[in-house]
From Swiss-Prot:
Transit peptide: 1-12
PANTHER family linked to this entry: REQUIRED FOR MEIOTIC NUCLEAR DIVISION PROTEIN 1 HOMOLOG
UniProt-listed Pfam families: DUF155 (PF02582)
Organism: Homo sapiens (Human)
Protein name: Required for meiotic nuclear division protein 1 homolog
């Protein structure tokens, strides 16, 4: 009996394994049939939509080139308008259907997949003329913002200077402010040792100036001249660039509190001048010097123009210093507006106030920005040249603007100082309250205990 059961179980297992193998074979045979059916349907659909000629049999008598030629003729006559219409829709290319051609064909032949390679080449040929721009979507690249360029300190002589005509006799006058002060005595000896000649024919009331002559000038129309002001400015008239660099190098040894080199070359003034017949004047940003004057009178007129240029470059340096100071306290109003705590000590606030007072003292008390120098009181012609140049350089307006900025900065620093004083007073009051509380507690302890 057990042997019979074992044989029945083995036979049933063999039957089940055979059935499973038959099922797998049937599934594998159906898969190629489905793929063949899908390929046939897709081929018929594309063939109907494109209206292409495909051979039914390989032995139809047509070779590869003839089939390509027939399909090309069909595409030329029937594919042009639908493709053009398709390209105009949403910037995307769509395959034209039979409805777009306005015709309905009935397929009467069976598909032949032997020409599939020819069919792929025909598709490539028909769509080779379609622009690739219709398939690639437009990309919106973000615009990169360029960093804004730092604004130059206001120089009216540069911004309002008209375009000058080209003139071979045109010469240049350049002014620099390099330090707070010069040692004119030592500078005179040092320049004389380098071959420069000092001009000693100046009036007695022009004591704070040094005038040096240059042998080789930039142009032959006027001798090269350099004016050194004790206030720390130098003005070059008709001097070569090479000579100018040499003088600036010698000047570094005799400077008191020199400025930054980049700031010196950035904040400068340059005017063109020319020799004419007639009275000297400043016309449309160009200095016109009288060619009939002798050397001493020509030096005095150049001194009047140079004095105004000296004030302009010194004021430009102080404008840059004030702008730097404003940037250092720019975060204070923003912090007060946002209700944040301002991290400034009492010593730092007093230092800021000292910087403001020093700058204000230089502009209003230690310079000739507010009044005309005494040198021009009995020289009306030179005073006219000086005032005209100062007006062209907008010195009065710039000084007024600087004083307004200084006043605003003073109000801000006073606010910070009062705020710190109030904090200190409040701290002292709390200390007094705490001490009184401790004393009261001691008294209460002595009474009750």
């Amino acid at each position: 009996m057990p042997a019979t059961l074992l044989r029945a179980v083995a036979r049933s297992h063999h039957i089940l394994s055979k059935a499973h193998q038959c099922r797998r074979i049937g599934h594998l045979m159906l898969k190629p049939l489905k793929e063949f059916e899908n390929t046939t349907c897709s081929t018929l659909t594309i063939r109907q939509s494109l209206d292409l000629f495909l051979p039914d049999k390989t032995a139809s008598g047509l070779n590869k080139s003839q089939i390509l030629e027939m399909n090309q003729k069909k595409s030329d006559t029937s594919m042009l308008s639908p493709l053009n219409a398709a390209r105009c829709q949403d910037e995307k290319a769509h395959l034209p259907t039979m409805k777009s051609f306005g015709t309905h064909r009935r397929v009467t032949h069976k598909p032949n997949l032997l020409g599939s390679k020819w069919f792929i080449k025909i598709l490539k040929r028909h769509f080779s003329s379609v622009s690739t721009e219709t398939f690639v979507p437009k990309q919106d690249f973000p615009q990169v913002k360029r960093p804004l360029k730092a604004s130059r300190t206001r120089q009216p002589s540069r911004t309002n200077l008209p375009v000058l005509s080209v003139n071979e006799d045109l010469m240049h006058c350049t002014a620099f402010a390099t330090a707070d002060e010069y040692h004119l005595g030592n500078l005179s000896q040092d320049l004389a040792s380098h071959g420069y000649v000092e001009v000693t024919s100046l009036p007695r009331d022009a004591a704070n100036i040094l005038v040096m002559g240059v042998e080789n000038s930039a142009k032959e129309g006027d001798p090269g001249t350099i004016f050194f002001f004790r206030e720390g400015a130098a003005v070059f008239w008709n001097v070569k660039d090479k000579t100018m660099k040499h003088v600036m190098k010698v000047l570094e040894k005799h400077e008191i509190q020199p400025y930054e080199i980049a700031l010196v070359h950035w904040e400068n003034e340059e005017l063109n001048y020319i020799k004419i017949e007639g009275q000297s004047k400043l016309h449309r940003g160009e200095i016109k010097l009288n060619s009939e004057l002798d050397l001493d009178d020509a030096i005095l007129e150049k001194f009047a123009f140079s004095n105004a240029l000296c004030l302009s470059v010194k004021l430009a340096i102080w404008e840059a210093s004030l702008d730097k100071f404003i940037e250092s306290i720019q975060s204070i109003p923003e912090a007060l507006k946002a209700g944040k705590k301002v991290k400034l000590s009492h010593e730092e606030v007093m230092q800021k106030i000292g910087e403001l007072f020093a700058l204000r003292h230089r502009i209003n008390l230690s310079s000739d920005f507010l009044i005309t120098p005494d040198f021009y009181w009995d020289r009306e012609n030179l005073e006219g040249l000086y005032d005209k140049t100062c007006q062209f350089l907008s010195i009065g307006r710039r000084v007024k603007v600087m004083n307004e900025k200084l006043q605003h900065c003073m109000e801000l620093t006073d606010l910070m100082r009062n705020h710190l004083n109030e904090k200190r007073a409040l701290r002292l009051e709390w200390m007094i309250v705490i001490l009184i509380t401790i004393e009261v507690m001691f008294e209460l302890g002595r009474v009750f205990f």
